[in-house]
Amino acid sequence: MDVGAIEYIHSQLVAQRDEGKAVLLVSLELDEVMEVSDRILVMFEGEIVADLDPKRTTVQELGLYMAGSKREAAQ
C-alpha cells in the first residue's frame, strides 16, 4: 500500500476507536500498533502474555513480550 492509503486506513481505525467501537488490528509494525491503539494484547504461543497501555509502554518492551522474553504476572 502507498503512504496515502495507509494514512487513510489509520484515520478510519482511529475514528472508529474514538466512537467507542472495538477495532482489532493485527500487525508486526510496532510503531503502527503504538500509534493507533488504546490497548494492546500480546499473544505468544497461543496465550495472551500481556495487556498493555501504549501510553505506558515502549516499542522495546512490546517487542520483548512478542518474542516471549517477558510475561506479565498472572492476574
Predicted feature locations:
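Glycine-rich phosphate-binding loops of nucleotide-dependent enzymes
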Residues: 1-75
